[in-house]
Amino acid sequence: MTTARRRPKRRGTDARTALRNVPILADIDDEQLERLATTVERRHVPANQWLFHAGEPADSIYIVDSGRFVAVAPEGHVFAEMASGDSIGDLGVIAGAARSAGVRALRDGVVWRIAAETFTDMLEATPLLQSAMLRAMARMLRQSRPAKTARRPRVIGVVSNGDTAAAPMVDAIATSLDSHGRTAVIAPPVETTSAVQEYDELVEAFSETLDRAERSNDWVLVVADRGAGDLWRHYVSAQSDRLVVLVDQRYPPDAVDSLATQRPVHLITCLAEPDPSWWDRLAPVSHHPANSDGFGALARRIAGRSLGLVMAGGGARGLAHFGVYQELTEAGVVIDRFGGTSSGAIASAAFALGMDAGDAIAAAREFIAGSDPLGDYTIPISALTRGGRVDRLVQGFFGNTLIEHLPRGFFSVSADMITGDQIIHRRGSVSGAVRASISIPGLIPPVHNGEQLLVDGGLLNNLPANVMCADTDGEVICVDLRRTFVPSKGFGLLPPIVTPPGLLRRLLTGTDNALPPLQETLLRAFDLAASTANLRELPRVAAIIEPDVSKIGVLNFKQIDAALEAGRMAARAALQAQPDLVR
């Protein structure tokens, strides 16, 4: 819907209407309501401003006319939300106690303030008002529901910073959202908004329109198109739960509204390779190309329906990830976000590049078709291999692509040997992020990154489901490769057909028993050292897929067909058990 500027309503009418809609005042008669309306004070509360803090004297009751407010406990968590028609602070005034919590404006709001003295004087002078309020409060207690602690974004600002018209993009986003719920659009003519001289004029003119649209729709898109004016751009930023910023120039503008950095931001990239300074400036939670796939992925994020796929490390067993992805996508499962560790990072990056399953599998076959990627052995000073083959393979596969330019969400995990910290790669070179995540200590040399010395993330988090689940925009499918260890009986540096006799075995290993090669021992140690958190206890886990890869050697990349089939079978079983994964 499109709206134009509105003149504010007359104050007296507004006060009576606002008071009449308050539950605790529902039963008072018109004369009492009129008397109370003459004493109230109208106040504009800017976005992010505190109405009051915990511990302050309860000196007023506030009636929300427009906007949205949150109650914040002294510990800092939000435990309730208030919108148009709600009263704030009434119990504290009646009890004569200090504020038990703070209240902050989520967006620009208008409240009616009733001074505590005025309210208590009226209660004492009007016994009928006391009875009416007690009845209303009793009803409220009977009908009370637990406060919402988590809430999906509903007001989405769409901002054009350059020459690209926002209207076609908004239409595409709204169309994509239609399959998830009802969407309204507030996009006043730029001639109207650019002519406004005072910010309060916008608050007066559009707050009621925004409140009404929010009450009757699942989402409201508020649009600041090119030429709409700085005041309107600020108003859109202030009202929005999230912002969608259109990127149609290589570098961000010199001036970015301060509120844009205080809201979750999604970028719609209208050119192929915007400069990473956009990410420096706005720290977006996601970015999407300006095409049908990108608009669909953005809509799923807004609706909380964005599916993530997180994959574990496991050497050659990680080839099962490609079979899982093939089975899921061929069944119609749409995945927007990918993440993983070690071999899971390789698969995640391939899928985030936008490859379909067939192309990804073909690329995986090409990846392992040549010489053994771990075959460039050297004197083991920092590692058993030089790492040159791995470097060439990773660089040849992913090139100079930046994570910021991938069409789908991606992260990988490595570990910093200096600090012992988990490093989550969401920015920079895809090749660098993958190479760090697969740097098995002792087998592949670590990666220097500034003051960091990065090794395989499996040392700390072999299946980073907790990282993916921290994103609240949708559910997550986990691919877990942890299985009973079946060691091979080879000697690593020797071909499997060469089995040393007992005497030579004793000379090489000091034992008559057949032991697994060093590479397998290192990889298995990762499985044991990594977190054993119960995946089912994590929020937003939709499914756990567990391919049976126990018979696949962790370094036997020639078993790609067996690994692919194990992945397909496990994904097929998950789909049969949970058909709702297809959305």
Swiss-Prot record:
A motif (GXGXXG) lies at residues 313-318. The lineage of its organism: Bacteria, Bacillati, Actinomycetota, Actinomycetes, Mycobacteriales. A nucleoside 3',5'-cyclic phosphate binds at residues 24-140. It comes from Mycobacterium tuberculosis (strain ATCC 25618 / H37Rv). GO terms for biological process: lipid catabolic process; phosphatidylcholine metabolic process. Residues 309-469 form the PNPLA domain. The keyword Hydrolase applies. InterPro entries: Acyl_Trfase/lysoPLipase (IPR016035), cNMP-bd_dom (IPR000595), cNMP-bd_dom_sf (IPR018490), LysoPLipase_patatin_CS (IPR001423), NTE (IPR050301), PNPLA_dom (IPR002641), RmlC-like_jellyroll (IPR014710). The keyword Ribonucleoprotein does not apply. GO terms for cellular component: cytosol. Keywords: Hydrolase, Lipid degradation, Lipid metabolism. It comes from the Bacteria. A motif (DGA/G) lies at residues 456-458. Coiled coil: none annotated. The active site is at S342, D456. A motif (GXSXG) lies at residues 340-344. It holds the Pfam family Patatin. Belongs to the NTE family. GO terms for molecular function: lysophospholipase activity. This is Uncharacterized NTE family protein Rv2565.
